[in-house]
């Protein structure tokens, strides 16, 4: 009987040629910008390292990373927290190197955020159970930080877009904060009137705003919330975890105007003082973002650039409304060429929005 043929490749045999990569669309639309191929080259990648400090309230110079002691009101109508009791979003804009010498070309380069490595800094500081914290036993260690915690970060080519949702629409927030305007009972659920852009650090209370899932096409955000009275904080430390920022088309956030935006909130729980009062405890977050150059179709024609340059030189006035739903403009007339003097001055002839000549009497 003939020996059976040995299965598998023979030693020393040439390796099989790998399959060709799957073809994907090269041209996609992203936020109104037509994305072309990725520019190759050694200098096409860059890394940005930064960190964001927490904005818990910082009630005094000795309590950075903590909020002011919290106090729960008995009545919904009496709720009026201080600014120092409200943890707020941390945000920063990172200016990137200018990579376009000529903005009048048909194609330009934009920075594209590809990956991010991030972690919370200072986790081991919460092992301090001997500094001003309430004792768990008469002669024991202090009570560890515990309670509701929220960890969130975002990386984008534009500021994070927010949706407002309130737990109590009757709460009176301090003037130094940005909260949903004209709050009603509908503000305690989805109300599309409450939209905002995270454009200021330490101004948007976390309890009032969440990332808007219907927007943020040019931003990637990640977050987890764990609620409860005695919930311990669970945090991981590693420099090997990488979060990919590309979408299903293989495109990451495109940094408009050479600007990269990072946002974060890291509320680890409640610190219990010796007196029994409690404060929110927050920690800073580290970012390491990798960017590459992406060739895109120039979305800014030369006429737009010139118009923008001229408009920037115009004095801005915060005056009464002359456009929009509340416009105070009554009528606009445009005259062209000349005609014989009409015998009836009340007879008005004009071209309507459909291009038709119309005559009407006053």
Swiss-Prot record:
Chief location category: virion
Tagged with keyword Phosphoprotein: yes
Outcome, altering residue 158 to K/R: Complete loss of infectivity ex vivo, defective in nuclear entry
Gene3D superfamilies: Capsid protein VP1,Polyomavirus
Variant or mutagenesis effect after changing residue 246 to E: Complete loss of infectivity ex vivo
Signal peptide segment: none
Mutagenesis / variant outcome for changing residue 331 to K/R: Complete loss of infectivity ex vivo, defective in adsorbing to cells
Stretch list, region C-terminal arm: 302-362
Ranges for region Disordered: 1-21
The entry's keywords: Capsid protein, Caveolin-mediated endocytosis of virus by host, Disulfide bond, Host endoplasmic reticulum, Host nucleus, Host-virus interaction, Late protein, Phosphoprotein, T=7 icosahedral capsid protein, Viral attachment to host cell, Viral penetration into host cytoplasm, Virion, Virus endocytosis by host, Virus entry into host cell
Effect of mutating residue 244 to E: Complete loss of infectivity ex vivo
One record GO biological process: symbiont-mediated perturbation of host cell endomembrane system
Effect of residue 255 to S: Complete loss of infectivity ex vivo
Motif Bipartite nuclear localization signal, chain ranges: 5-19
GO cellular component: capsomere; host cell endoplasmic reticulum; host cell nucleus; T=7 icosahedral viral capsid
Pfam families: Polyoma_coat (PF00718)
InterPro entries referenced in this protein's UniProt entry, alphabetically: Capsid_VP1_Polyomavir, dsDNA_vir_gr_I_capsid, Polyomavir_VP1_sf
Effect listed in the UniProt record for changing residue 50 to S: No effect on infectivity ex vivo
Subcellular location(s) per record: Virion; Host nucleus; Host endoplasmic reticulum
Family designation: Belongs to the polyomaviruses coat protein VP1 family.
Biological function: Forms an icosahedral capsid with a T=7 symmetry and a 40 nm diameter. The capsid is composed of 72 pentamers linked to each other by disulfide bonds and associated with VP2 or VP3 proteins. Binds to N-glycolylneuraminic analog of the ganglioside GM1 on the cell surface to provide virion attachment to target cell. Once attached, the virion is internalized by caveolin-mediated endocytosis and traffics to the endoplasmic reticulum. Inside the endoplasmic reticulum, the protein folding machinery isomerizes VP1 interpentamer disulfide bonds, thereby triggering initial uncoating.
Domain notes: The intrinsically disordered C-terminal arm interacts with neighboring pentamers. The unstructured nature of this region allows to make different interactions depending on the structural context: pentamers present at the 12 icosahedral fivefold axes bind five pentamers, whereas pentamers present at the 60 icosahedral six-fold axes interact with six pentamers.
Subunit note: Homomultimer; disulfide-linked. The virus capsid is composed of 72 icosahedral units, each one composed of five disulfide-linked copies of VP1. Interacts with agnoprotein. Interacts with minor capsid proteins VP2 and VP3. Interacts with host HSPA8; this interaction probably participates in virus assembly. Interacts with host SP1; this interaction enhances the efficiency of viral packaging.
The protein, known as: Major capsid protein VP1
